């Protein structure tokens, strides 16, 4: 594997920490008046999402992770694995529940996703920013029940539950922001 010196470390770079891929989110090069220069950095583990801060000497090296972000199309799930296809090479990969990272609740089929591959296996799936899903179950909105502009829970066709405004009814298609898990708009 390739290594990089602390002078070449940048935000967004993918590195290996204890044989697990991580993304550098913050770096700060510090050169004190007395003593050796060092780099303070924060990184987020791709699989678990855990954020860690580390201080390294200027002479240290970090190992670059062999991680690739690939545009892929979600095909189907067989209950245990979620199957994705590269639209250019038609190569297929399958992700398990841990590799999905919670994205499975936004996917119904034929969505374009960004799949992070490490050693050829998917370790993280990023769904599209917005998806259109049908509401399968929600309580009817009661007229006049709007003091405070509240909302109500709605179950979507993929099993995800989001809060929707009172005027949205069952069997309607809504647009959901997958980054926050919030209702965005009704689809006509």
From Swiss-Prot:
Here the disulfide bonds are none
What HAMAP family has UniProt attached to this entry?
EF_P (MF_00141)
Which terms in the GO cellular component ontology are assigned? cytoplasm
| A matching Pfam family | Elong-fact-P_C
Give the Gene3D superfamilies listed for this entry. Answer: 2.30.30.30, Nucleic acid-binding proteins
State the UniProt keywords alphabetically.
Cytoplasm, Elongation factor, Hydroxylation, Protein biosynthesis
Q: What does this protein do?
A: Involved in peptide bond synthesis. Alleviates ribosome stalling that occurs when 3 or more consecutive Pro residues or the sequence PPG is present in a protein, possibly by augmenting the peptidyl transferase activity of the ribosome. Modification of Lys-34 is required for alleviation.
Family of this protein: Belongs to the elongation factor P family.
* An MF annotation (GO) of this entry: translation elongation factor activity
How is the polypeptide modified once translated?
Answer: May be beta-lysylated on the epsilon-amino group of Lys-34 by the combined action of EpmA and EpmB, and then hydroxylated on the C5 position of the same residue by EpmC (if this protein is present). Lysylation is critical for the stimulatory effect of EF-P on peptide-bond formation. The lysylation moiety may extend toward the peptidyltransferase center and stabilize the terminal 3-CCA end of the tRNA. Hydroxylation of the C5 position on Lys-34 may allow additional potential stabilizing hydrogen-bond interactions with the P-tRNA.
| Metabolic or biological pathway, per its Swiss-Prot or TrEMBL entry | Protein biosynthesis; polypeptide chain elongation
User: Predominant location of this chain?
Assistant: cytoplasm
Please give the name of this protein: Elongation factor P
Concerning InterPro entries, the annotation shows: Elong-fact-P_C, NA-bd_OB-fold, Rib_uL2_dom2, Transl_elong_fac_P/YeiP, Transl_elong_KOW-like, Transl_elong_P/YeiP_cen, Transl_elong_P/YeiP_CS, Transl_elongation_fac_P
Q: Where in the cell is it found?
A: Cytoplasm
Residues that the record marks as modified (N6-(3,6-diaminohexanoyl)-5-hydroxylysine) are 34
Superkingdom classification of source: Bacteria
Q: Which GO terms describe its biological process?
A: peptide biosynthetic process
């Amino acid at each position: 594997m390739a290594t990089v010196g602390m002078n070449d470390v940048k935000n967004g770079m993918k590195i290996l920490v204890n044989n697990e891929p991580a993304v550098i989110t913050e770096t700060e090069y510090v050169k004190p008046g007395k003593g050796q220069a060092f780099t303070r950095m924060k990184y987020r583990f791709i699989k678990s999402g855990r954020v860690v801060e580390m201080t390294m000497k200027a002479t240290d090296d970090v190992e670059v992770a062999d991680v690739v972000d690939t545009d892929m199309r979600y095909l189907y799930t067989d209950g245990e694995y979620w199957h994705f296809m590269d639209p250019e090479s038609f190569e297929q990969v399958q992700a398990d529940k841990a590799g999905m990272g919670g994205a499975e609740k936004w996917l119904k089929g034929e969505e374009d996703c960004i799949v992070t591959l490490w050693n050829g296996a998917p370790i993280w799936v990023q769904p599209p920013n917005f998806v259109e899903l049908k509401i399968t179950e929600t309580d009817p909105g009661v007229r006049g029940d709007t003091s405070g502009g509240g909302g109500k829970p709605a179950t979507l066709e993929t099993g995800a539950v989001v809060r929707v405004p009172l005027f949205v009814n069952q069997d309607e298609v809504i647009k959901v922001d997958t980054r926050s898990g919030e209702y965005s708009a009704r689809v006509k």
